[in-house]
């Protein structure tokens, strides 16, 4: 049994774990491993917003343009494509890329092809919305958890290997305990989301400044290779409960500290649905996320269902990744998006 925290990220604890040293988890789970070379990763959520069937093809073309830009020098190591409908009834396509080298991501973002497209006046007149939500956590600022050991999705795809069975799971507080930084840091938030350019109510170009320790969770489900019994388990038992919880956070998450919640379905380049989905949630802090997870009936139902089936999973692939990041390592930029998109809803106007 291994610790979720890799050897080179271990340090003397000043903050204790939630369980005693002799704790034994009830079923096996694994985490992604990377060597000491990995100092920081970049998680880029690049969105296209549209409304209704009339704009769908133009939105797909814009999504495909973003994907093609990933083939430029310094593009991401892995990416995926998703669709979701938000709380305001808008459709959103997201291209999600992961870089294991922040300098490469910076070069890509500043390249003429990428920068000129984003800053072009054409973006303002196409009838589509665009957004960039980028977080770059350091190695000690994120954790992963998988119920399987191969072909890891998301940030796991830029890591080097999979751990052996790990200790820190199956109890409330285990998410925090898997963060290397949790050994010495409570990961408390600073400040508020602030509008630093533009006006969300007017649309156009808007830039939001984040704050330290925004928590970002991606929690995924892959039933593409599952056989009939597991497909039924997911579609009939897990999904309805999951959908209820995720819709609740999408529509009612603000008082709980949830800035944005999107339950997305993976798609191909033509917009066809795949049998893969995940939830992506931005929270004011890890503590706010924990409080909801440990106490709200919608998540408790999800947790109980997972506990009941976890030990018997064969081809149904369930996982999550959670990170916090520094304000200086975040980008939140929007073009023509409605004012409840992403970080726009909860951002306050910066004092002048």
From Swiss-Prot:
The active site is at residue 320. The substrate is directly bound to the heme iron. Calcium may act as a cofactor. Heme b binds at residue 299. Active when the heme iron is in the ferrous state. Is very sensitive to AgNO(3), is also inhibited by hydroxylamine and phenylhydrazine, and hardly inhibited by thiol reagents. Not sensitive to chelating agents and serine-modifying reagents. Changing residue 279 to A: Retains 53% of wild-type activity with butyraldoxime as substrate. Optimum temperature is 45 degrees Celsius. One of its GO terms (molecular function) is lyase activity. Changing residue 219 to T: Retains 26% of wild-type activity with butyraldoxime as substrate. Its EC number is 4.8.1.2. It catalyses: an aliphatic aldoxime = a nitrile + H2O. The keyword tRNA processing does not apply. Optimum pH is 5.5. Another high activity level is observed at pH 9.4. Homodimer. This is Aliphatic aldoxime dehydratase. It comes from Pseudomonas chlororaphis.
């Amino acid at each position: 049994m291994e610790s979720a925290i890799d050897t080179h990220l271990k340090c003397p604890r000043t903050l204790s774990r939630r369980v005693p040293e002799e704790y034994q988890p009830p079923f096996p789970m694994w985490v992604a491993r990377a060597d000491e070379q990995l100092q920081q990763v970049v998680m880029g959520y690049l969105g296209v917003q549209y409304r209704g069937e009339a704009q769908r093809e133009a939105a797909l073309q814009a999504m495909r343009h973003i994907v093609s830009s990933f083939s430029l020098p310094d593009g991401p190591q892995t990416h995926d494509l998703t669709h979701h409908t938000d709380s305001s009834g808008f459709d959103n396509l997201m291209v999600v890329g992961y870089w294991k080298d922040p300098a490469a991501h910076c070069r890509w973002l500043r390249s003429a092809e990428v920068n000129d497209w984003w800053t072009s006046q054409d973006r303002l007149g196409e009838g589509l919305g665009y957004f960039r939500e980028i977080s770059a956590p350091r190695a000690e600022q994120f954790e992963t958890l998988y119920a399987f050991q191969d072909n890891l999705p998301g940030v796991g795809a830029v890591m080097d290997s999979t751990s052996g069975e790990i200790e820190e799971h199956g109890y409330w507080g285990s998410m925090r305990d898997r963060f290397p930084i949790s050994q010495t840091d409570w990961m408390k938030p600073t400040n508020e989301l602030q509008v630093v350019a533009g006006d969300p109510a007017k649309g156009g170009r808007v830039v939001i400044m984040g704050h330290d320790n925004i928590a970002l969770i991606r929690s995924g489900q892959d039933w593409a290779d599952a056989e009939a019994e597991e497909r039924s388990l997911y579609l009939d038992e897990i999904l309805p409960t999951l959908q209820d919880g995720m819709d609740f956070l999408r529509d009612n998450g603000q008082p709980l500290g949830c800035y944005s919640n999107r339950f997305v379905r993976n798609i191909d380049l033509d917009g066809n649905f795949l049998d893969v989905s995940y939830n992506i949630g931005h929270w004011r802090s890890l503590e706010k996320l924990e409080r909801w997870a440990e106490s709200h009936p919608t998540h408790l139902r999800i947790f109980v269902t997972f506990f009941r089936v976890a030990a018997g999973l064969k081809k149904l692939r369930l996982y999550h990744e959670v990170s916090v990041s520094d304000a200086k390592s975040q980008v939140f930029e929007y073009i023509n998006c409605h004012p409840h998109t992403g970080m726009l809803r909860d951002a306050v106007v910066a004092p002048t």
